[in-house]
Amino acid sequence: MDPNTVSSFQDILMRMSKMQLGSSSEDLNGMITQFESLKLYRDSLGEAVMRMGDLHSLQNRNGKWREQLGQKFEEIRWLIEEVRHRLKITENSFEQITFMQALQLLLEVEQEIRTFSFQLI
């Protein structure tokens, strides 16, 4: 796994956790939780690809891994839309930069998960 991606996740999560968005702080906490969940999923998929023979193990652990993969792509799409929405409504430059970087990271992670999943199929 790319160390820059790991530090990007950690940096964005830390900055998002410091943001105060008023009444929408619950939404932001939900986004942070989904980011963390997505990172863990991407990491586990990447580890399975590195072991390359691990498809059977992955299927045994979770017989519905393709369904789970589809759900993760839905989460990514939702997060992308949510981040885009936040980007449009915020006027704070710190928040704009954070959300732009979060959007870029989400797009990178989506591509990584696609690549990993194609290697596992």
From Swiss-Prot:
Which UniProt keywords are given for this protein, alphabetically ordered? Answer: Host nucleus, Host-virus interaction, Transport, Virion
Report the GO terms under cellular component: host cell nucleus; virion component
Coiled coil (residue ranges): none
Q: What is its main location?
A: virion
* Biological-process GO terms, alphabetical: exit of virus from host cell nucleus through nuclear pore
What is the annotated role of this protein in its UniProt record? Mediates the nuclear export of encapsidated genomic RNAs (ribonucleoproteins, RNPs). Acts as an adapter between viral RNPs complexes and the nuclear export machinery of the cell. Possesses no intrinsic RNA-binding activity, but includes a C-terminal M1-binding domain. This domain is believed to allow recognition of RNPs bound to the protein M1.
Q: Where is this motif: Nuclear export signal?
A: 12-21, 85-94
Per the UniProt record, the source organism is: Influenza A virus (strain A/USA:Iowa/1943 H1N1)
Also noted in the record is: Average number present in a viral particle is estimated to be 130-200 molecules.
Q: Which family does it belong to?
A: Belongs to the influenza viruses NEP family.
- Name of protein: Nuclear export protein
Entry's HAMAP family?
Answer: INFV_NEP (MF_04067)
Which Gene3D superfamilies does the UniProt entry name for this protein? Answer: 1.10.287.230, S15/NS1, RNA-binding (1.10.287.10)
Localization: Virion; Host nucleus
This protein's assembly is summarised as: Interacts with protein M1. May interact with host nucleoporin RAB/HRB and exportin XPO1/CRM1.
Recite the lineage of the species: Viruses, Riboviria, Orthornavirae, Negarnaviricota, Polyploviricotina
Pfam families (UniProt xref): Flu_NS2
